[in-house]
């Protein structure tokens, strides 16, 4: 009966207008895609951008989705890992946050909370509120791409999402040995690693997946993976525009599943590859603010500290 029901259905044909027809698919080899990616990665050494920032904290998995207001802001970044991000309230242009990272440590100043937060850049302590998981170095991974060396294993596949077609480069790396649980000293851990290294077949894991839209062969998405196959970040790139003899995406959407937030960055003004003074990445603790050191034990994480006077700096 089900077959007859489908057989009795009226067949309809939809004529696609020329303007709605999908763009012809472009073709490329793995070597050509790697070359295009590396040229783009090397092309951007610094950037100074006026942006709008829109943060969504929470996900369907957490059960709570909280949409934050869109704020204006600035992003300063310089290789290898220096970044400063300032968010400002609309109309009054008053800072709502100011954060910096040099790749080793980060600092965040939140005027409304009178808090100055510091910690190591590789901190993986998840906060109860997703918005507190936002770190300046998360943006470094999105705005600066690491170059893929010739010795790095890379796989190529084709993929699709809806009507879009993609080339996907999968970058793999040797699995990072983890210390043996319960090892009481460094000697036992070292011995375990030595025994593991004696295996003739290396253990591999995915480092990144780079998506190229076959409509124009531009990078449209980069997935970065942590150990164990967990997605650390999923970054979408669109609205590519020519800037100073190179091109750059003016829309960057960052999703970090483990940190439970999404950040949409819309570029309004952009300058690339111009020198940025080192003091632009300096953020001293304002006087009278509460210092929260996330690198310390929770019991010692907050205390009153009167830092030197510091006027807010704007890029």
Regions found by a protein language model. Give the residues of each.
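C-terminal motif of bacterial Sec signal peptides marking the signal peptidase cleavage site
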Residues: 3-7
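Post-signal peptide N-terminal segment of secreted/secretory-pathway proteins
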Residues: 53-97
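N-terminal leader/targeting segments and the immediate start of mature chains
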Residues: 8-70, 298-315
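Amphipathic hydrophobic-ligand
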Residues: 64-71, 95-101, 202-204, 229-234
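Gly/Pro-enriched, hydrophobic low-complexity segments
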Residues: 9, 156-288
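An acidic-aromatic
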Residues: 80-138
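Extended lipid/amphipathic-ligand handling interfaces
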Residues: 34-36, 72-77, 99-101, 235-242
């Amino acid at each position: 009966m089900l077959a007859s029901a489908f057989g009795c259905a009226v067949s309809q044909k939809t004529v696609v207008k020329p303007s709605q027809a999908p763009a012809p698919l472009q073709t490329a080899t793995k070597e050509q895609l790697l070359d295009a990616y590396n040229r783009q990665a090397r092309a951007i050494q610094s950037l100074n951008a006026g942006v709008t920032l829109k943060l969504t904290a929470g996900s369907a998995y957490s059960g709570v989705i909280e949409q934050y207001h869109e704020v204006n802001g600035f992003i300063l970044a310089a290789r290898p890992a220096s970044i400063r991000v300032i968010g400002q309230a609309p109309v009054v242009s008053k800072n709502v946050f100011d954060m910096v990272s040099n790749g080793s440590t980060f600092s965040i100043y939140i005027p409304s909370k009178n808090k100055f937060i510091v910690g190591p850049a590789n901190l993986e302590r998840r906060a109860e509120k997703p918005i507190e998981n936002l770190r300046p170095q998360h943006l470094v991974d999105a705005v600066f791409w690491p170059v893929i060396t010739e010795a790095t294993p890379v796989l190529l596949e084709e993929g699709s999402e809806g009507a879009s077609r993609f080339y996907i480069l999968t970058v793999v790396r040797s699995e990072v040995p983890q210390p043996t649980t319960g090892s009481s000293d460094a000697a036992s851990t070292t011995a375990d690693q030595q025994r593991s290294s004696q295996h003739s077949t290396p253990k591999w894991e995915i480092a990144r997946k780079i998506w190229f839209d076959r409509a124009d062969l531009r990078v449209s998405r980069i997935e970065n993976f942590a150990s164990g196959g967990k997605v650390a970040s999923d970054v979408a790139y669109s609205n590519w525009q020519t800037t100073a003899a190179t091109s750059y995406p003016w829309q960057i959407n960052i999703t970090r599943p483990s940190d439970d937030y999404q950040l949409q960055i819309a570029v309004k003004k952009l300058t690339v590859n111009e020198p940025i003074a080192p003091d632009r990445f300096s953020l001293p603790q304002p006087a009278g603010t509460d210092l929260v050191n996330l690198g310390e034990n929770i019991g010692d994480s907050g205390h009153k500290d009167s830092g030197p006077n510091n006027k807010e700096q704007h890029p």
